Amino acid sequence: DGKPKRKTFYGASPQEVRRKVLEFTGEQAKGKTLREVCEGWQAEAEQEIRYNTLTCYKKPTEDVLEAFGDVRIRDLTTLDIEAFLRALAKKGFARQTVRVRLVVLNRICKYAMRHGDLTSNPAEAAQLPKGLTAKKREIPSNDALAKVTELEPKGFNLLPILLYYTGCRRGEAMALEWEDVDRNARIIHVTKEVEYHGNVPVIVKWTKSAAGRRDIIIRSKLLELLPKGKKKGLLFPGKDGGPMTKGEFIQWWDDLKLGITPHQLRHAYVTELYEAGVPAEVAMTQTGHSDIKTMRGIYTHIRDSQTAKARELLDAYDNKDVVKS
């Protein structure tokens, strides 16, 4: 809260009190350990970071504390962090797994800078090891997308169609109400999401500055499929009229037998943004990504994947010519 904190020392004699004061001031002069700073960051993060994100940070935070918990944060260097990341890489961790540990360290160090425990952030300059395996972004096949577009757009069937044509995350779509859908302006207002705490759905409304809060363009293909007339309530309610439980959602989705996940439809949407020539800066206003670096990275991945596919096709064509000759 910015106010000075008072600490009281007790002892059997004035000499013992002085000794305790000297020990305390000596420890204070050394600075806080990363574990102590992390406790403050976690308390703040619980108020500001989404529940699902915090859940994803739990194991990475444990790994960071195991490596650096007792280190004075002012003694932590970029080289220390890079050595930690290389050790993870040697264990066979994928790029995303290693990257999240760096993200956690970066957040802790940023917190330390704001509170005067650091003057610079050693995590910002740290680089990921080269050669890390990247988890492949699975784009749905044309057959899978055809199954989606052939669904009758009623009830829960509308969900995969909406995910494909808007790129909404599952939680965002599950929180949508008909009042959020403006057919005339061709806009869907995304202002909240459903988080699952175990099986229990919890609707979380975002602040105006939240990255996920956005207006998504209703494409002509989706406009044709959305029901006309005024409707109220959730687009995809559960049996009790409120948000679906996690179990209800899984059952409904499995019954569709699409053979793909909701998030794969988000990948398909982003791919179509790229193929349509939508600039990354504009695309992120539709996808809700929090920074342009992430959006550009996704675009680069799509381009590289398409280049690799083109190479395969050309090689197959060349080999066909060799067989003919």
Located regions from the model:
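C-terminal secondary-structure termini that scaffold catalytic or DNA-interacting sites
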Residues: 185, 194-213, 220-222, 240, ...
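DNA breakage-rejoining catalytic core of tyrosine-based enzymes
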Residues: 7, 74, 117-120, 129-150, ...
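Basic, Lys/Arg- and aromatic-enriched nucleic-acid-binding interface segment
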Residues: 95, 99, 114, 118-119, ...
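Short, polar N-cap/turn motifs at the start of nucleic acid-interacting alpha helices
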Residues: 180-187, 278-298
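Active-site/catalytic core of tyrosine-dependent DNA strand-transfer enzymes
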Residues: 143, 193-196, 217-259
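N-terminal core-binding DNA-recognition domain of tyrosine site-specific recombinases/integrases
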Residues: 9-10, 43-119, 134, 242-248, ...
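Catalytic-site neighborhood detector that most strongly recognizes the C-terminal catalytic loop/helix
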Residues: 194, 223, 287-312
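Active-site-proximal segment of tyrosine recombinases
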Residues: 172-174, 260-261, 270, 277-289
